Regions:
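Bacterial N-terminal signal peptides that target proteins for export
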Residues: 1-8
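Bacterial Sec-exported substrate-binding components of ABC uptake systems
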Residues: 6, 22-89, 194-221, 287-291, ...
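C-terminal motif of bacterial Sec signal peptides marking the signal peptidase cleavage site
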Residues: 17-20
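Structured C-terminal subdomain patch of bacterial secreted/periplasmic proteins
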Residues: 82, 188, 275-342
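A short, structured surface patch at a secondary-structure boundary
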Residues: 82-136
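Alpha-helical, coiled-coil/dimerization segments enriched in small aliphatic residues
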Residues: 109-114, 234-261
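Proline-aspartate-enriched helix->loop->beta-strand connector
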Residues: 141-147, 163, 269, 273-277
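Extracytoplasmic substrate-binding proteins
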Residues: 157, 161-227, 320-342
């Protein structure tokens, strides 16, 4: 009898314990899962950091080759929230990707029209492309400063403001690859890889179209117009991507590499006689006033195949000379050529 009462007591206690365990509105396992999810969300927000970013190039020289500047990798502990940008191509890419947090830009007279909104007072003025306002930049307390060739001489001084100074510029002899490298920097650092892939897909599609178009012509020449004078560019130049990436065949490779091209007389254009003649209007880009058609379409040029077959392609000066190196501007260049030659 005593044993029977003892068993009843044990079963009663077990029932109370089981009821207590099952009485919670939310199972203990679910509670643990919720806590785990919160931890995972926190981890996701910091995924990829610390992140080491490499410059688009590790060194560059000034125009006369007398000085060499070396650029270092930068390790970021988190996504930069206060961004200062000198390079307009990189600003173009940040704008295309919808990156927020830009606090300062170079408010130079050469600020591209499609980036005009950054001239507003809400964006701090960090000087010109050649003359940074170091004290004003320091006052912005940036987490990162993005530079290109014209600021190379100020690299060490800018690093005194923040160690996070990244070279994102393009270089003449490897323009397209350095452009893509700069896009990769923006996409990874600001978690915009999906947006970058979408934009690059548009560029790839446009490149396919322009390469197909370029197959129709055997020779071409890229030139730049400046106050009545012409200079020419081949594959080893800042506009070499017209040949290498767009697919146009150069009429000659024998042109000295220079950021402003090799001086050409109009007679040289007639001698080369390219089927397509590209003319970038530097005068319009720099001064806003240009007599390009009157100067180019002279009696000598009127004898060329390009003139006779209406294939002198006048390219937008501000876009080609001052802009470029960004997602929006590179797509716009391709679309301009397509519109002129289709």
């Amino acid at each position: 009898m005593k044993n029977k009462k003892l068993l009843i007591l044990i079963f009663a206690l077990l029932g109370i314990i089981l009821a207590a365990c099952g009485g919670s509105d939310e199972p203990a396992e679910d509670q643990a899962n919720e806590e785990g999810t919160t931890a995972e969300e926190s981890a996701d927000s910091d995924s990829g950091f610390p992140m080491t970013i490499s410059p688009t190039v590790t060194s560059s020289q000034n125009r006369d080759g007398s000085e060499t500047y070396t650029f270092e990798e930068v390790t970021f502990e988190s996504v930069p929230e206060r961004i200062v940008v000198f390079d307009y191509g990189f600003l173009d890419t940040l704008d295309a990707l919808g990156v927020e947090g830009i606090v300062g830009v170079a408010k130079d007279s050469s600020l591209p029209a499609h980036l005009e909104k950054y001239s507003a007072d809400e964006y701090g003025n960090i000087g010109t492309l050649k003359e940074p306002l170091l004290e004003d930049i320091a006052a912005l307390e940036p987490d990162v400063i993005f530079i290109s060739g014209r600021q190379a001489t100020f690299y060490e001084q800018l690093k005194e403001i923040t160690p996070n100074v990244v070279f994102v510029g393009t270089v003449d002899d490897d323009y397209w690859n350095t452009f893509l490298a700069s896009v990769d920097i923006a996409a990874k650092l600001f978690d915009k890889e999906a947006e970058a892939e979408e934009y690059l897909a548009k560029i790839d599609s446009a490149l396919e179209e322009i390469n197909a178009l370029a197959e129709n012509y055997d020779t071409s020449l890229v030139t730049m117009y400046n106050e009545g004078e012409l200079s020419g560019f081949s594959t080893n130049s800042r506009f070499g991507y017209v040949y290498e990436n767009y697919g146009f065949k150069p009429v000659t490779e024998d042109i000295n590499a220079s950021s402003h091209g090799s001086n050409f007389g109009y007679e040289a254009i007639l001698d080369f006689d390219p089927q397509v003649l590209f003319v970038i209007d530097r005068t319009a880009a720099v001064s806003g006033n240009s007599n390009i058609k009157e100067d180019i379409e002279n009696d000598i040029i009127k004898q060329t195949t390009a003139y006779k077959e209406n294939r002198i392609v006048y390219l937008d000066g501000p876009l080609w000379y001052l802009s470029g190196g960004g997602l929006q501007s590179e797509l716009a260049k391709i679309e301009e050529v397509l519109a002129e030659l289709k």
